[in-house]
Amino acid sequence: PAKQVAFAEHAREKMLRGVNVLA
């Protein structure tokens, strides 16, 4: 489902942002 894909994209972006903050 497109909604699930959008959620995965958002989660990945959020995780990457967190990694950037920790880096």
Swiss-Prot record:
Induction trigger: By heat shock.
Entry's EC annotation: 5.6.1.7
Stated family: Belongs to the chaperonin (HSP60) family.
Protein's name according to its UniProt entry: Chaperonin GroEL
Example of a GO MF term: ATP binding
Subunit structure of this chain's protein: Forms a cylinder of 14 subunits composed of two heptameric rings stacked back-to-back. Interacts with the co-chaperonin GroES.
UniProt KW keywords: ATP-binding, Chaperone, Cytoplasm, Isomerase, Nucleotide-binding, Stress response
